[in-house]
């Protein structure tokens, strides 16, 4: 719907939601697929950026021209979808956009106005730096810096986002590579070889930098998944949703973030599970696209990972000897 639904006081008794549509959404938010919040801005509050699964047809009004990529927005509710909403004026409330990646499937914030982007059209990872925003509704993008990480091959599945998550403590970026059925990690702080590709046919506008980066460190965290889509990181656990079977897996990560010490999977009744996020209270939320719902999971503590909650487990730290298979509140002995 090229729009944003804002849920206020989520999960509370006074919860309410509103639906906002920007006047220029048919380009700047056409077929929006993913969202990532960034740094605080004294005028715009926390800025956020969106990915668009579009080749830029202005909602079917024209032939695709592939002039598409990430858009930057203000989260301030006095700016977003409020400024420049009259026809014939400035270009809505967006505050920047770059256009080298049609069919965007995922996005993650790095720092300042730098975002990582899942380029579904060219099938690779791209780093976008908007640098200074151009203010609401303007169109000067010439200070943008774009780097294509061509070693990181990604496979798009139409209609299923491949979300991304950055660990800001160590620079490891996690990507749901949906079509390949895997979760990959990329060391964004590691070395690489940068080549100037200014003037390449994939460049769609004047830029301050356009380059290709090769030789980066990356790897596979897990594979054999059924269309992984949502992804969220919380206290050393990476949560991943699988659109193909409605399951969510939590991966306890190694100290370096490149491997897994253990994992657990739960099933949901989602018709088409997609995005994940951990809220301020530490509870996991997921999107069910088919049923048009946002669902919260209220977890229980299970220190020993024996699938018996600590409140019912007589010996919660010993998963080899104790469990409560009949749910009577007493430990089984075997």
Named regions from a protein language model:
Residues 30-33, 61-108:
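Asp-box/WD-like beta-propeller blade repeats and closely related beta-sheet repeat scaffolds
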Residues 50-70, 128:
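Short, conserved, GDST-rich strand-edge loop motifs in beta-rich repeat architectures
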Residues 299-334:
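Extracellular calcium-associated, cysteine-rich motifs in secreted modular proteins
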Residues 1, 25-46, 94-114, 148-171, ...:
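Beta-rich, blade/repeat-based domains predominating
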Residues 271-301, 305:
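Blade-level signature of beta-propeller repeat domains, shared across WD40, Kelch, NHL, RCC1
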Residues 1-2, 9, 40, 51-55, ...:
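Short loop/turn segments immediately following the C-termini of beta-strands
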Residues 174-182, 186, 211-255:
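Loop/turn-rich, solvent-exposed surfaces of beta-rich toroidal or solenoidal domains
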Residues 6-14, 73-86, 128-141, 185-207, ...:
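Short loop/turn segments immediately following beta-strands, especially the blade-tip
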